[in-house]
Each structure stands twice: as structure tokens, then as C-alpha cells.
């Protein structure tokens, strides 16, 4: 087994979890692949309010963000959906990615279609591995 490679992968995942935590504390912004839609500002403002203990103000920003989203329909593994959102209300309709040592937000509204393999390892239930580009 190639434990050196596994150690590198887990090291990157742990570093990105620290980056993610800093983003939720409003200490660091997540990265974006494309310019984010305007409603992302309200999600980020909600994180900042939560970090300051201002839960009601955070809810106002989060609600404003959700109301501003116009289209989030698409396909995942061949099935269609009209709306998709993370179960973590802090990120809502954003896919969290860890790639190349970066913590990235990719709004579902910027994705047309997704495919994801079934989990093969226990860690796949925590961190979903990407498919190769030829499988997209």
C-alpha cells in the first residue's frame, strides 16, 4: 500500500477542514471557481453574523440569499431536481469542494449536471471523491 500518498491526501483534507472552519468563523473567504452570484454575499454575511453571535441577523441574510436564487434545477446521477441544497444551512445551495489545498464554494446554480460514484471507502462518506473529467 502507498501510505505516503494516503498521508498526503489526508493531510490536505485536514488542512482544508481548518480552512473551512476559518471560513465559517468569517476569518477567511472560501475560494470560487467562477465569479459568485450576488446572493453569495448574503450567505457570507450570515456566516459573519453567526461568528459574532448575531443569530437573528444571520437568519435575515440567509433568508435574503435563498429568496434571491432564481434557478437551481439540474440532474444528479441521471435524476432531475428542481431545487438542491446542502443539509448544512450555513452553505445552503452551495457545493463545498476541496481541491489542490483550497476550500471552494461552487453554487449549485453554476452546475448543470453532476455524477458521483458510490462510496468505496469509509472516508467517502465524509469526503466525496471526484470523478475523472471523462466521467463528467
Residue ranges of predicted features:
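Long, positively charged binding patches that form subdomain-scale interaction surfaces
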Residues: 50, 55-136
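Alpha-helical protein-protein interaction scaffolds
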Residues: 1-52, 57
